[in-house]
Amino acid sequence: VLLSFLLRRLSPPTALVAFSILLAFAETGLGQGSETPDKPLSAQEADVASVTGEVLIPKLIHWCGDCHQGEDPQSGIRVDRLGRIPRDREILLWEEFREQIVQGKMPPEDAPQLDEQEKAEWLEKCEQMLHVAKSLPVPNRGGSRRMTVAQFQNTLHDLLDWQVDLTARIPPDAISKDGFTNHVESMGMSPAVAEAYFDVADHVVSNSLIDPSQPPAIQAFQMAFGRQINPAPCPDALVLGANSLLLPNSDFVVTENFPEKPFPYEPLRMQRTFRFIEGYVGNDTIREWKEFESIYHAVFACMRGTPGYPVGLAYESAPDGLLLRPAIPSPEIFGESNTYGPMANFKISLRELPSQGRFRVTVRAKKLEDAQLLSESDLLSPSEADPLSVVIAAADLGNGLQIADDGIYQLDVVAPSMEGRKEVRLLIDGLPFTHAIAASTAALPSDAASDQLAKVAGTPMLRIRLSKGEHEVAIDGPGAAEVEALCWRKLAPLSKPATDFEAFEGYGPFVGVHVGLRRDCGSTLNPVGPAQRVASTDWSDLVFEGAIENFPSPDVEKNNVNYLAGIREIGVRSEYYDGRPVPRLCIANISFEGPYLTQWPPPSHQQLAGNRTLESIDQNEVREPLGQLATRMFRRPATADEIDHLLSVYQKAKLGGSTNQEAYRDAATVVLASPSSFFLHEASLSDEAEPLSEWELASKLSYFLWNGPPDDPLLKLAESGRLTELLDQQIDRLLVDPRRERFLQTFVRQWLQLEKLDLLAIDRKTYPEWTRDLKASLRQEPIAWVGHLLDHNLPASHLVDSPWMMANEVTAAFYKLPDRPSGGPSFELLRTDREQLGGLLGQAGLMAALGDGRQSNPIKRGAWLARKLVDRPPEDPPPNVPKLPEGDISKETFLEKLNRHRNQPGCAACHEKIDPWGIPLQNYNASGCFVDLPSSETTSQLADGTKITNAIELKKHLAGQLADQVAWSFARHLACYAIGRDLTYSEAAQLKTQVETLAAARYPMRSLLRTVIHSDAFMTK
């Protein structure tokens, strides 16, 4: 299968070479290291084998064989299959046998019991055997493991500047019992996986190598905004599909501004003439050819979204830009937003974007010096504002507004005759402020004198900061005719209305860019990187970049005759987080450039072939770029034999009639498809433990802490032989690099099984606050928390209980925290006095994920805690768990039902290790929020006899008496992730001893990470 695939994609010489590479590597035993001939047993091994095989195992079979033999043994344990020389996991199993017999749990009560003398003799022999078995050396034979799909993607990104996400092309990685995808035993190399890696290698090389002599084609345009900015708007009535909502063409202008580059390129101008037969009259059906000629039939300013913005208008045009309020998410249906997207949903809709390459979107924006819109309840008390007001009758607005002092002013609108609620638009110095208001409670006297005008009350409309002097004021809108006067009052400097406004104007909106495609009933858009804050009222340029292939694109045939077919979209939003009032975002212009290139040939080509034009390259010059590429991809110096082999691939392709570029492509594909590129090797020369080579250490360290390849500083230290010497320095350097986020995202997600949250379908009728955006933030909360603990080397007890927590605007609103962060999606450290919060167990996303979205599940929570936080994993449940006995159980509490279940045969043993951890966590409901419950529903007794009455007590107990177990659990999981396999018994024992040295310092988190890296499990092979 694989050879057939290679012959389809590569030239025959290259295909055969690549196939032979894979076969040769597969024959060595992937991930297992090289085999060595059987050796005679040592004296110690012979003693262990004799005692185990002649005494211990026969007795176990005699005592326990009824339950633990045959095809369906209890707990999956067969005593007749035990090895004579216990190693690693079997040592743990023997320790469990010993413990069960000491405690009298084996044999069970209903079976014949052991004679005390016989029992004592067996235990003595078992203890002696275990003492010797634990000291036996474990053969080390190096090993190899395939990179995970994400690691291979990161390798292509970091080493070749490859930006396109290709992970969907490779079968997903299997998951180990600890939840990790990088475990050597699950990193097999099936034909399907091998074919996928070769396919990716071929795709990357084919799409990266270009002809540098051919100039690239670049698309570049800008859409600028402003009231009446367009001197020559399109005369046609522009309509874009059903529910068309387009910005007036007079308020935006599109230009194609091609930037200067240090290399020649071809400007890719957008099409301006079109001929369509349907789709150009909105939702109406029509079949009639019509011709169009204007760039405004190619590029639209679309505002289609969910209607009904709650306060003010979703968007308005100002003299110098487009004003946007936060894009409030639309209601969700089955976890997805409804058809038309959020409110305030601005998009550039256009017919043409590049099909491949990196693009750049630049948003020139500022924070508006805005007014805060008010509700009818925002009336001022006498102490909150100056007693004197500036009152202007509606008929006198043309005379302007005279402000005597700088300050914050509240505007009340006097409109006693207004019927219902109507929109009023106020223009202050040209800026629009639109609000729907109702009738005021006081009328303006027809013969009012100045002293009476000062006492006029009206409907609160807005608060705004005004400078001393004259301001132009105008009013229009549906309710303008019923407005009799405007009443301005200056707020007292320290009053609550004034401080609330200062908080409002101090907050900066966040700009988000989204790219995708238009649908008949909405859009499919993906974000281009994280949102960026606009903190200043001065103009600034915010840059967003991505690879166009990573975003949704329409699949339509060329020259489709439907006006609406194949529309791409670039969405620009003021992002919505916690619903607080936010100054509007003012956008002056949006620029697009793609492919975005700063040099030619691009970095992806240069990493493969340098600056060379491959068609004119001399055969003698090929060796250098191939050697450089192999060294980069292998993360060590390529040997002369390896380079000779690559050169022979090139030469064979040339002899077969390939061009220079085709031959080089074949050789480069072999490099990327080589096991040395996508396998992590630790080459061992003997069964004895050996230190990692400097090159191996560089890769092992970077794929641990970056989930990607080592950079030049690491490789230079490896080359000089000083990496081991400067290891701690490099650990710190890697952990402050942005790439460490890849480690946190991968390790924490897999350790804590956050994929359960991805699969959770919460009951939205019961928990309407559980939006898609909240779920996304709750998914990041544990990652942010573990990252903070590592960054600041805090005690491991903070994993489970802490007076601090990480929150962003979305989660802070969900938890109803009194102190709100102001960093949008970014997590900030907050102190909390609510003991149910702080630590992993207080995080709603984790607790909710361990349920079904309708009710909490103490069994799932208990099993998860036992496995992940205290490293006391219960056995897997038996295959055929019996049902609850028949009877009327409708009036039973959950604990009563649980007791009925656990008292059945085959259930109690597992639940003894699960339920005591999970029952106190009943304090967290299905949405993950803390609720007070009677202690009878949350009380349990742990195996050590400790009585726990609620979740808070459980957190304290874990952080106190069980802090050493929590620290060990973190360290063990971290070590298994770091080395890509389970720890051997001796490795675990050594690591545990090293971890215990940190007890006096309360197990600092970064120190635990250092301990893992300095352990023999990590540093030797």
Explain the meaning of each model-derived region:
Residues V1-L10:
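N-terminal secretory signal peptides that target proteins for export/translocation
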Residues R9-V17, I403, L466:
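Low-complexity, charge- and small-residue-enriched intrinsically disordered regions
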Residues P13-E27:
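Bacterial N-terminal signal peptides
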Residues L30-I77, R89-E96, Q100-K105, E109-K1021:
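Low-complexity, glycine/serine/threonine/alanine-rich intrinsically disordered linker
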Residues D80:
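Short, aromatic/basic-rich helix-turn unit that serves as a nucleic-acid recognition element
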Residues G83:
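The substrate-binding groove and active-site-proximal loops of carbohydrate-active enzymes
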